[in-house]
Each structure stands twice: as C-alpha cells, then as structure tokens.
Amino acid sequence: MDGIKYVVVTDKSIRLLVKNQYTSNVESGSTRTEIKHWVELFFGVKVIAMNSHRLPGKGRRMGPIMGHTMHYRRMIITLQPGYSIPPLRTKRT
C-alpha cells in the first residue's frame, strides 16, 4: 500500500495546520483505519481523528470524445497536541 499520494496545499489546509490537522490525498481504495495505522507507524504520531471525503474526477475532452480523470479520496488527519508531521513533498500543478 502506498498510503499518502501527496499533501494538499490550499488556503483551508494551511489554516488547518494551526489546529494540528494535516490534509492529503490518499489512494482511493484505502480505508480510514488503514491510513490511520499507516500514519501512526510511519511518522510515529498519535492520530485522534480522521475525516475523509471522495472528490469526483474532472471531465477532460480530446476532440469530440469526452473522458474524465479518476476520482480520489482526501483525508484530514488530526493529531494529538505535541505531535507533528514533517513537511512532505507537494504535487506541483
């Protein structure tokens, strides 16, 4: 399992860092418990809450043919006070 794909850097995600909440896109087939165990083992932190939602894929047109990108899952991970996750690589768009 790959776990976290990349960190999401938006206005809301930067605002949530003050509350010790980290936002990232993860594999669409992974569950909350899988991601929670993976984050706790890999980073050595304690997760107290996880919020997730699935975002729809975007439409892409190639001439007369309409296609779409794959949907993905976004997780907001809340850590216990005193714990933090080091900066991860962000996806450039």
Curated annotation (Swiss-Prot):
GO molecular function terms noted in the UniProt entry: mRNA binding; rRNA binding; structural constituent of ribosome
Keyword Transmembrane found: no
Entry keywords, A to Z: Chloroplast, Plastid, Ribonucleoprotein, Ribosomal protein, RNA-binding, rRNA-binding
Database matches in Pfam families: Ribosomal_L23 (PF00276)
GO CC field: chloroplast; ribonucleoprotein complex; ribosome
Subcellular location per the Swiss-Prot or TrEMBL entry: Plastid, Chloroplast
One BP term from GO: translation
Presence of the UniProt keyword Transport in the record: no
Family matches, as InterPro entries: Nucleotide-bd_a/b_plait_sf, Ribosomal_uL23-like, Ribosomal_uL23/eL15/eS24_sf, Ribosomal_uL23_CS
PANTHER family membership: 60S RIBOSOMAL PROTEIN L23A
Summary of subunit composition and partner proteins: Part of the 50S ribosomal subunit.
Known role: Binds to 23S rRNA.
Family assignment from sequence similarity: Belongs to the universal ribosomal protein uL23 family.
Protein name as it appears in the record: Large ribosomal subunit protein uL23cz/uL23cy
Encoding gene (name): rpl23-A
